[in-house]
A protein has these predicted regions:
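Nucleotide-activated chemistry modules centered on ATP-dependent adenylation/adenylyltransferase
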Residues: 1-292
């Protein structure tokens, strides 16, 4: 079975389990990136009942937001239900710019509260499909599987690392409430994704055509320093919004009597972009202790 057929089989299995367990169609997550574009195409080819959902992060590039709207319009014309979920935190509307002052620290590679709030809340108590791939990072290779049962209690989590995993029966019969995930293209390489995109003539986010390697949140700490610098040169308004949010974060820290060695939002931004300590200022360990 080739990778396309295997991915389709995974989607068909997930759709069956979704209807059986949740009495709802499979929820396909869509970010406007190349992986989720392939994911939707595979779901269509699989002939399953599914809907498409985008989590509006508030920090995506404008071009990506417009592309998502265009694609959703085209999908809906083909009878696919699409929806955009706006983020909420503590039962209130949220954004990257409100979240930073509330969390009292910048989002970092070690503390990615932004992902948890702005992206990963979508699909609670549903079966979702994502475009996660092992080739994207060593961490994903270690911690992500073909299918997953997510639970706050790590002891109750189930991750199937292969299609014939010995935990498969446990996964299918699990009665605990929670989110289930299928990652149909988890074993695809970058070349696999692009080859499929070109062979099937799939729409492509225009930012890739500009040479962008990724189309996620602008300024994401998981991106390299050079990529982040280029992003802020390309979209300077986002740099201003981060600096403003960091300034409000400092005000919130002072109001709570927390250490506040930074003087301005620009100081925080410089520290954040360097991903290192500016002399005399809070370390990452200090911030993580506060978060805990």
């Amino acid at each position: 079975m080739d990778k396309e057929q295997l991915a389709i089989a995974r989607l068909q299995d997930a759709a069956r389990l979704s209807e059986h367990r949740y009495k709802k169609p499979l929820m396909v997550t869509y970010s406007g990136g190349k992986d989720s574009q392939v994911l939707v195409a595979l779901a269509e080819r699989a002939g399953i009942n599914f809907e498409v959902v985008n989590s509006h992060t508030t920090a995506d590039a404008p071009e990506t937001v417009y592309f998502i709207r265009e694609q959703f319009k085209a999908m809906e014309e083909h009878g696919i239900k699409c929806s955009i979920v706006m983020p909420r935190y503590k039962d209130e509307p949220a954004s990257m710019w409100t979240l930073i002052p509330q969390k009292l620290m910048p989002p970092t590679r070690l503390v990615r509260y932004c992902c948890a709030v702005l992206k990963e809340n979508t699909g609670r108590d549903r079966f979702i499909a994502t475009g996660v791939r092992w080739a994207e990072s060593t961490n994903r290779k270690k911690n992500r599987g073909t299918m997953e049962f997510n639970h706050r209690d790590k002891e109750k989590r189930i991750i199937l690392m292969g299609d014939n995993d010995e935990k498969r029966q446990l996964f299918e019969t699990c009665s605990i409430k929670g989110k289930m995930t299928v990652n149909p293209i988890v074993d695809w390489s970058d070349n696999d994704v692009w080859d499929y995109t070109h062979s099937e003539h799939l729409p492509v986010n225009p930012l890739y055509c500009e040479g962008q390697k990724r189309v996620g949140c602008i300024g994401c700490p998981m991106a390299g320093r050079g990529d982040r610098q280029r992003e802020f040169m390309r979209w300077p308004a986002y740099e201003k919004m981060y600096i403003s949010a960091f300034g409000r974060m400092l005000d919130a820290r002072k109001a709570k009597g927390l250490p506040c060695d930074w003087q301005t939002g620009m100081d925080v931004f410089r520290w954040w972009m360097e991903d290192d300590n500016i002399n005399g200022q809070l370390s990452m360990d200090d911030l993580m202790e506060e978060e805990q």
